[in-house]
Amino acid sequence: MAGNFDSEERSSWYWGRLSRQEAVALLQGQRHGVFLVRDSSTSPGDYVLSVSENSRVSHYIINSSGPRPPVPPSPAQPPPGVSPSRLRIGDQEFDSLPALLEFYKIHYLDTTTLIEPVSRSRQGSGVILRQEEAEYVRALFDFNGNDEEDLPFKKGDILRIRDKPEEQWWNAEDSEGKRGMIPVPYVEKYRPASASVSALIGGNQEGSHPQPLGGPEPGPYAQPSVNTPLPNLQNGPIYARVIQKRVPNAYDKTALALEVGELVKVTKINVSGQWEGECNGKRGHFPFTHVRLLDQQNPDEDFS
């Protein structure tokens, strides 16, 4: 389906200073190809293309080289000796944001093309948990964070969930009041023995009962076993089963295509969530959320 929008009408797709969480709140649940462009909060002068695709919200960094073009652009030409800005996304370069959007009207990003900008009537929406529904999780692994908006934590930390803008990334608060995004597969549900929130955060956690984040919740989530550490590649091969199809960007030759049910040999586990592995004789990187690690003690049980 070809995109149905005017790329020159910047007011329809450019949102300026907008956080990742706010972008997700606007795009979550929208049909594939709905998008917006915002300023990067971690790299001043750059942009981010946020897109609803494959039942999630993806964020693509757009790097700007040279003087950043104003939005909307000024009709004036750049002064002599000053090179116009170039915009880069992946391996592609463009002279302007409209040109970039026109390109992705007919070319896939990951699993979708750009169809239309998100409606501004969606602004301010989101799924925020009420205080009386406060939910807590406990960290299964250390997480150092990869983005300014991430919340670093250590194994065993107790975090309060503030909202769930994405399936695999939730917004949480730690015992010091710091807030940020956390990867869902790195935590487990935590049910406090005491109803006191103040006693829970930073208090004694004995007597609590952890629950895996999978269980009765719908959808194919990639969840590590409770209290089982990430496997050590030095102990031998690690295998995973694909639980979510992935059709990578045709221009990314290092990305690994995945079909549900396929077996992947994991060769490298990166904290960023982009793992590396082999599948059907090909090597490449893939999101850890698309696979489920097999029981390394009894892998043959899952090899069918």
From Swiss-Prot:
Start and end residues of each SH3 domain: 132-192, 235-296
Span list, region Disordered: 61-85, 201-229
Single GO biological process annotation from the record: response to cholecystokinin
SMART domains reported in the protein's UniProt record: SH2, SH3
Effect of residue 275 to K: No effect on interaction with PEAK3
Post-translation changes: Phosphorylated on Tyr-221 upon cell adhesion. Results in the negative regulation of the association with SH2- and SH3-binding partners, possibly by the formation of an intramolecular interaction of phosphorylated Tyr-221 with the SH2 domain. This leads finally to the down-regulation of the Crk signaling pathway. Isoform Crk-II: Phosphorylated by KIT.
Similarity comment: family membership: Belongs to the CRK family.
Free-text domain note: The C-terminal SH3 domain function as a negative modulator for transformation and the N-terminal SH3 domain appears to function as a positive regulator for transformation. The SH2 domain mediates interaction with tyrosine phosphorylated proteins. Mediates interaction with SHB.
UniProt-recorded name of the protein: Adapter molecule crk
Lineage: Eukaryota, Metazoa, Chordata, Craniata, Vertebrata
Name of the gene encoding the protein in the UniProt record: CRK
